[in-house]
Amino acid sequence: FYKGDKCRLFAWLGDISENIDGLLYKKDLQGTYWDYTSRINNLTKEGNVEFGNGKKPIDLLKRIIALYPGDEITVLDFFAGSGSTGHAVIAQNVEDGGHRQFILCTNNQNNICREKTYIRLSNVIKGYITENGKIFSPMPASLKYYKVDYVPISERLYYEYADEIL
């Protein structure tokens, strides 16, 4: 709000603090998407794979992953795109010795999985050198690529197959 010619910031105490056992604690802002992108020289080339739009900053994803108290979780990203989530999981495991896993899914539009996601994660695991000469050390991890597709079957075949499995 404005008081005279000066702009004043106004916030409700309940929005910026937390009451724990009768003590009032100030909440700290953890940052925004833009705080994380400003730290990165060129977000579009992260992981040594060119990707114009939609890459999520690794530092931001690592921060989100680290908020979960355990280090043996499986992180699911069903809009995988450039593979940022997988990159962040691998990097966070290297940083804190965790055993997290990830599952990345995509509809493979424009062959994105084969040409971007897989190559990026392979680069992260093997290590790479950027075109500017910056060296990224290998990060130990394993990577498997599966192609899943719809296979139409008749209802009768479906139940026969289900009986075989059971």
Residue spans for each PLM region:
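General structural signal for secondary-structure boundaries
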Residues: F1, P57, D149-Y150, L166
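Conserved phosphoryl-transfer catalytic core
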Residues: L104-R156, A162-I165
